[in-house]
Amino acid sequence: ASEAVYHRLLADIEAASGTRLRILPDIIAGASAGGINGIFLAQAIETGQSLEPLTALWLDNADVDELLDPDARPARALTKFWATPLVWMAARRPGDAVERTVAPDTREEVRMKLSRFIRSRWFEPPFGGEIFSTMLLDAFDAMAATPAGPSLLPDGHPLDLFVTVTDFDGHVQSLSLNSPPQVIETEHRLSIGFRGRGGSASGFADPAELVFAARATASFPGAFPPFTVRELDRVLKRRHRAWPGRDAFLARVLPRRAARGEAEDAVLIDGSVLANAPFAQAIGALKNRPSRREVDRRFVYIDPKPGHRSIHLNREGEEEAAPIGENAPLPGFFRTIFGALSDIPREQPIRDNLEAIDRHSARIRRMGRIIQALRPGIEAEVEGAIGRMLFLDRPTPARLSAWRGKAQQRAAASAGFAFPAYAHLKLSGIVEDLAARLFQLSGEDAPMMREAYRQAIWKQVRAIGADQLTEDAGSAAAPVLFFRTHDLAFRIRRLRFLARRLAETLELEADADSEAVQAMHDAIYRALALYTECEGNDFYNDHVRAAAAQVPTDAGAALEAMAQARGLRARDEAADMLLAEALANLPKAGRRTMLLAYLGFPFSDIATLPLLQGDAVDEYDPIKVDRISPEDCTAIRAGGANATLKGIEFNNFGAFFSRVYRENDYLWGRLHGVERLLDIVISAIPAPTRLPEGALRNYRRAAFLAILDEEESRLPHVADLIAGLREEIG
C-alpha cells in the first residue's frame, strides 16, 4: 500500500538526518469541488473515518444520468426530437471530442448521455439540488458506517476548515468613513468555517452542517439550482433526520439574516464565483497555531488544470490561442458576458495572497537575523542583572520568578526612551485582542458595535491608569498589574522563543543528554498548552459570555471576568514548576543556554515586536508555498493536464459523461499527488542531510506501483491505462 511507502520514507529520513518528521494537515480551505474535497478530508482527519465512500461517490454517482433532476429529464424518446440530429452531428463528426478522447467501447455511452443531457430541460439547471444534497449526506453516512481509526491530529490540536460561498442577493454591511460617518454596501462573499480538535469527543460537526457547506460551495451556476436551507430541510425531513443545532448554525454562518428571521431566504451559489482560492482564510488561521515541535509550515494549493478556463466558448468548442495583432477581433457578445460575470472572477490569480505570505515570511527572516545579532549583548545584560549565581543555583519556581522579574526590569531600563513605545505597542495589542475576543463572545456582529467595544475597553484601561507607561514603573504600578493579569500573548511568545532556541541548539547536539533534552522539550510545550487553551472561544463559559454582552456599559466587569477565567497568575506558577524541574535536570551548559534564552526574551521582544507591528508570531519559520498540479509532475509522463486528464473536455464537465473519464482522472490525481507530496516531504529536510535524488526516484516508483496495485480492481474501465503506466514507470 502507498501508506507503507510514506512510513518507510519517514523512517529513512529519521535514520539519515535524526529528524522525526510528522505531517499534519491542520488548515484546509477550498471552494466549489475543492471545497467538497476539503470538507470530506477534514471530516476524515478529525474523526479517523475512511475516505473510501467519497471515492465511491465520485466514481459511481458523479454522472449526468445520476445528477439530472427528475423534472429535467427528457420524458420520452420524442422529447426535443428535433435536437437529436444536432446531437448526432456534433457527437459523430470525424475527429470530434468523443472520438478523440473516449475509448471505443464507451463512445456510445458518452453519446447517449450527451443526447439525454442536451434534450433535458433548457434555461433551467439540469442537475437536481436535492439529489446532490442526498448524495452528500449518503457519503457522510457511509463514512460513519465504516470502521474508524484514531484521529489523525494530536489531542487538542485544532483543525480549521473554510469553504467559500457566494450570497447571490448579498447582505448589507456598514462602513465607517469621515463623511458621511457611515455608508452601506452589499457584500456577496461568505466564508463558512468549522473548527475541530484532535481527540475531541464532541466530533467535528453535524453532517447536516457539512452537507450545507458542501452543497452551497459547489452550486455551480447553470448546472445546479442555487442552494437554500429549505432544500436541505426537505432532504432531512424525508429521511426523518433531526438537525438539533440548526438555528445556532444558521445564526453563525448567516448572522444578519438569522437575526431578522430570514436565514431560509438566503440564496447561495458556488463559492468560486468570487473567491476561487481562499488563501485569506487560511492565512488568518495561522494566528495562534499551537506548535508542539519545530514547524516547517507549508501552504499547499491544488490546481488540477492551470491555464484551462472553467468556461471557454469558441466556434469549434475547442481550446485555441487568443488572436493578437492589429486586426485581431474583439471578444464576442457572449464571450464578453461569460468572461465578465463568471470566468474572469473564477480564474483570478492568487498573486495578492502569495505576496502577503511572502511579506510575512520576510518579516520572520528579518526578525531571526536581528535576534541572532543581538544575542551576545542580551546574554551579557542578563548575567549583569542576575549575577554569577544564576548558573550556580539550582532553578526553583521561586528563583525562576525572581530572576524573570530582575531581567524584565533590566530590559526596561536598558531600552531607555524606546521602552514606552514598546510598552504602548504591547498594550495596544492586548487591548485590541481583548476587545475582539469579548466582541466575538458577545454574539454581536455589527461593525459599529465592534468599534463601541474597542472604545469601551480603551476607556476602562485609561480609567485604571494602565496606559501610564514608563521604564521605571514599579511592580505595583497599574500598567504592570494590567500586563500580569492580561498579557497572554507575551507569555506565549516567550515559550515559543524558548522552544525555538532548544530546537536550534540542544536538540541538534549529538552529545546532549537526550532524556533531559526531551524532558525540557516536553516541559516547554506542556507550559505552552497552559496558555494556548485560553485562545479559543470555546474555552470561555457562560459567565464570561454574559459579561461580554455588557461591555459597552460595564467594561470593567468584562475584563474582570476574562481575568478570572484565564487565571494567568496560577498558570504562571504551574509553568514555573514545569520549567524549573526541566532546567534543573539539564547538563550545566545546556541549562545556561536555556536560562539565557528564557530570561533574555524581554530584551529580544523589545527589539522585535515593533518590527512585527505588534503581531504575535507563533511559528518562527517562514511559510513556504507549494503547488500540486499535473504541470509539475513529469516523473511518469510529461505534458501536464492535456496529456493525462480527460475531464477537462466539454468545458471541464467531461467527467460527468463517462466513468472512464472519472476513473482516469482519479488515478492520475493519486499519482500526481503522491509524486508532489514526496517532493514536498523530502524538501523539509535540510540540504546537507537530505536523501539523494536516486532515493527519491525509488520512493516514487514504489509509490506509483503501490497505487496501481491498490486501484487495479476498483478501476476496471482503465485497465489498459494501468497496464501502460506499469510499462512507463518501469
Question: What does each model-found stretch correspond to?
Answer:
Residues 360-392, 645-681:
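Long, C-terminal catalytic modules of enzymes
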Residues 81-88, 410, 415-418, 422-425, ...:
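Acidic, Ser/Thr-rich low-complexity intrinsically disordered segments
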Residues 62-77, 105-109, 334-574:
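Non-catalytic, alpha-helical, charged scaffold/linker segments
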Residues 1-141, 175-178, 182-188:
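Patatin-like phospholipase
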Residues 51-69, 275-277, 284, 291-355, ...:
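Catalytic or ion-translocation cores adjacent to nucleophile or general acid/base/metal-coordination motifs
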Residues 112-123, 156-288, 332-335, 437-485, ...:
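Active-site gating loop/helix substructures
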Residues 17-24, 148-158, 261-262, 291-296, ...:
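Short helix-terminating capping/connector loops at secondary-structure junctions
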